[in-house]
UniProtKB/Swiss-Prot annotation:
Catalysis performed (reactions): Hydrolysis of proteins with broad specificity similar to that of pepsin A, preferring hydrophobic residues at P1 and P1', but also cleaving 20-Gly-|-Glu-21 in the B chain of insulin. Clots milk, and activates trypsinogen
Gene field: pepB
The protein's assembly and partners: Monomer.
Disulfide bond annotation, renumbered to this chain: 320-355
Name assigned to this protein: Penicillopepsin-3
Propeptide part(s) removed at maturation, as residue ranges: 21-70
Enzyme Commission code: 3.4.23.20
Location in the cell: Secreted
Length: 394
C-alpha cells in the first residue's frame, strides 16, 4: 500500500467533510459518458514548466536547474495535430455550460465567476449565482498550482449537472481573484475527482461531485478513457467493455491522504526483462508527465541514444529523431504498456531537434505520479467501492 507520510501540503489539514448533498432525478440508477471537447487555439508551452508544475503540486522542492529551464524564454508553439488543442469537458454549473478540466489529483470544483473583473474573464464562460444559489457565509477557498498560478474566492451551493445527473446543492467555488495564467488558458475551471478529504474549502471541506452523486449511479465508479492526440471520454456509473481489450485488473487504493494511490510491483524497458520493485504512486489526470523514481528513469534513458539529463532544459531530453523504447508498468501481475510514441512529450522549443521526455524523476515528491503519459495508454476504472483502481489496455 502507498505511504504518503512525507507529503506536506496545507490542504491535508482539512479533515471534516461537508454533508452529502441531494441528487435530483428519479430513483433509477444512472450511467452516462462525458465526451471531452477539442478547444482550438494556439498555446505556447515550455516543457520544463510541466515538470516544475507536477513537483510543486505535491509539495516537492523544484531543483534550481528545472526552475531556470521553466523560466527560460524558449517555448513551444503547439501544432494542430499534436499539442495545439486542449481537451476539456462541458459541465452545467448553475445553468451555465462550462468547459472544465477533470483532475483526479485534486478535490475542488472551482470556476470563473461574475465576481471577477470583466477584463479577466474574456473568452471564458462565467458562473453567475442566481437567486436559487446559496452563498456559504464565512466560507472561502484558495488554491495555488505548480506554475505559480492561483485562484481564490467564495463558495456557493448550486446545482451541477453532468450527463443528466444533478447534484442540487453542490459546493461551487466561485473565483473572486485569479492569476494571469488562468486568464490565458481556455479552461473555465476545474472539477476535482480525488477524495473529498482534501477539498480546500475552509472552515469545512466540501464533498466532490462524484461523492455527492455516487448513490444515484448504477455503480460507484467513473472511468477515464483518455486518448493520444485526440479527445477522450469519462464514463460514470459503468465500465464500457467496448473501450478496452481483455479483462480489467484491479489493485487496492490507499486513499489515506485523499489521492487515488496504488503500488505497482515492477517495470520493464523496451523488450527487456521485468524488474521487480515496489513503485508507490497516484493516478492523476491533472498531471501531464509520468514521474518515477530517478533510478528507473535513468535506466529508461540509458536505452535512448543521445539522451541526457539536461540542466539547460530542466529534465531528460534526447534527439527528436531518436528511437524510444516502450515502457511497461506491472500492476498486480498485469503489464500496462505505454507505447513509445507517447513518451516523446514535445520539442524543447519551436523548431528544435531536441525533445523533452514524457518520463521524468519524482525526486522530492515522496511518491510517483502516473499522469496522462501513462493514463492515456489504459482504460482506467476509479472504483469507490474498494476503493480500488482497475486497468485494461485500450
Amino acid at each position: 500500500m502507498v505511504s504518503f507520510t512525507q507529503l506536506q501540503l496545507a490542504f491535508l489539514g482539512l479533515s471534516a467533510l461537508g454533508a452529502a448533498v441531494p441528487v435530483t432525478g428519479t430513483s433509477e440508477k444512472k450511467t452516462f459518458s462525458l465526451n471531452q471537447v477539442k478547444v482550438a487555439g494556439t498555446k505556447t508551452k515550455n516543457p520544463a514548466e510541466h515538470y516544475a508544475n507536477a513537483l510543486r503540486k505535491y509539495g516537492a522542492e523544484v531543483p534550481s536547474h528545472v526552475l531556470a529551464a521553466a523560466a527560460a524564454t524558449g517555448s513551444v508553439t503547439t501544432s494542430p495535430t499534436e499539442f495545439d488543442s486542449e481537451y476539456l469537458t462541458p459541465i452545467d454549473v448553475g445553468g451555465t455550460t462550462m468547459n472544465l478540466d477533470i483532475d483526479t489529483g485534486s478535490s475542488d470544483l472551482w470556476v470563473f465567476s461574475k465576481e471577477l473583473p470583466s477584463s479577466e474573464t474574456s473568452g471564458h464562460a462565467v458562473y453567475s449565482p442566481s437567486s436559487q444559489s446559496q452563498l456559504l457565509n464565512g466560507y472561502s477557498w484558495s488554491i495555488s498550482y505548480g506554475d505559480g498560478s492561483s485562484a481564490s474566492g467564495n463558495v456557493y451551493l448550486d446545482y451541477v449537472t453532468v450527463g443528466g445527473v444533478t447534484a442540487s446543492s453542490q459546493a461551487v467555488e466561485a473565483a473572486e481573484t485569479i492569476s494571469s495564467e488562468f486568464q490565458q488558458d481556455p479552461s473555465d475551471g476545474l472539477m476535482g475527482l480525488a477524495f473529498s478529504s482534501i477539498n480546500t474549502v475552509q472552515p469545512e471541506s466540501q464533498s466532490t461531485f462524484f461523492d455527492n452523486v455516487q448513490s444515484n449511479l448504477a455503480s460507484p465508479v467513473f472511468c477515464a478513457d483518455l486518448k493520444y492526440e485526440a479527445p477522450g471520454v469519462y464514463d460514470f456509473g459503468f465500465i464500457d467493455s467496448s473501450k478496452h481489450t481483455g479483462s480489467v485488473t484491479y489493485t487496492p487504493v490507499d486513499n489515506s491522504q485523499g489521492f487515488w494511490g496504488f503500488t505497482a510491483s515492477g517495470y520493464a524497458v523496451g523488450s527487456g526483462s521485468t524488474v521487480s520493485t515496489s513503485i508507490s504512486g497516484i493516478a492523476d489526470t491533472g498531471t501531464t508527465l509520468l514521474l518515477l523514481p530517478s533510478s528507473i528513469v535513468k535506466k529508461y534513458y540509458a536505452q535512448v541514444k543521445g539522451s541526457s539529463n539536461s540542466a539547460t532544459y530542466g529534465g531528460y531530453v534526447f534527439p527528436c529523431s531518436a528511437t524510444l523504447p516502450k515502457f511497461t508498468v506491472v500492476i498486480n501481475g498485469y503489464k500496462a504498456v505505454i507505447a513509445a510514441q507517447y513518451l516523446n512529450y514535445s520539442p524543447v522549443e519551436t523548431g528544435s531537434s531536441t525533445c523533452f521526455g514524457g518520463i521524468q524523476s519524482d525526486t522530492g515528491i515522496g511518491f510517483s505520479i502516473f499522469g496522462d503519459i501513462f493514463l492515456k495508454s489504459q482504460y482506467v476504472v476509479f472504483d469507490a467501492s474498494g476503493p480500488r483502481l482497475g486497468f485494461a489496455p485500450q
